[in-house]
Each structure stands twice: as structure tokens, then as C-alpha cells.
Amino acid sequence: SKRLNVPQIPSPQWVAHASLWLPMLTAMMMAHNILPGLAALFSIAAGAIFTVQVYRWWYKAVLKEPMLWILFAGYLFTGLGLIAVGLSYWISSFLNLGVHLIGVGGIGVLTLGMMARTALGHTGNSIYPPPKVVPVAFWLMIAATVIRVLATFVSGTAYTHSIRCSAALFAVSLLLYAWKYIPWLIRPRSDGRPG
């Protein structure tokens, strides 16, 4: 919020706890087939909390900051994925949709976003503005997510091509990250500080 010069919007303590515990509880219940209907409701509730949080925290100025909007995107994909997983109790095809929203969109996008931020800081480089290749890597990861999610609605050759395209975009995104960041990660910090 300092970066955007906007007030920080605090979350109630119960929201912070629920966004942590509900997804874990859902996963444990689903893994052991314990009260699947209740697990579905927990998953939908968790996804709703994630999605509402994105709405509450959103400012248009976020769009100018790749290091911020990538985190919003990953958090939103995770929330939508949790909702889809919950709805799969009634519409079974939604499970595949939810798994890939969380797997590629949540884990893939958030991991790349956090690696990009933290590695800059820990190598003594400025987070803002990020290297020009970073937003490109971010967009490729988002494209990989969208294509992988859309692949759940097609079959045959279209499905195969979609999977390959998504995997290629995912890989290129991470390769761009590695290409830019590995030289920093194997050298002493740019600012000369220890670490």
C-alpha cells in the first residue's frame, strides 16, 4: 500500500484464520472422503473469502505494478479454484477445472511472483521497477493458466494441443525467470551487503 500511496485495508482476524484453515480442512476431508458435502461447502467458503479479499484490496493503480498484480492474479485464481473444487461435489467435471486453477493459476502464478520479488530483494537489487523480462514471464504464466483451464472444456486434438501449449508457456515463463535471475543468485549481492 505504501508503493501505491493508498491506505492499507486490514482484514478481520477471523478472515485471516478462515483463509488458512478452510482450504487445509477441505483438502484433508476430501483426501479421506470425510463428509464430502461439508468439505465442498468449506471449499466454496474459502474460495469466496479469497475472491472477496481480492475485491477489497483492489486498486486500479495495481495494474501499473507487475510485482503486485501478479500476486492479485494468483490469489484470485486460487479463490476461483477453491470454488470450482467445492462445486465439483454437484458437478463432477468442475474438479479438473478447480485443480488446474489452483495448480497452475494459484501455485504457478504465486510461486513465480514471490520468487521474482524475494530474489530481487535478497540479491540487493531494487524490486521497483522489475526487470523488463519479469512482466513477460508473468503474462506467459497467466496465459498458461488460462489455456490449461480452457483445455478442460475441449477434447481430442484440441485438448492435446492445449495441454502442450500450456506446458510450453509455463516452461518458457520459468526459463525467462532463470535466465534473468540465476546470474544474480550465483554472485555476491549487488549492494555489497552480506547475504
Task: Cite the ranges covered by each PLM segment.
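Hydrophobic alpha-helical transmembrane segments of multi-pass integral membrane proteins
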Residues: S1-G195
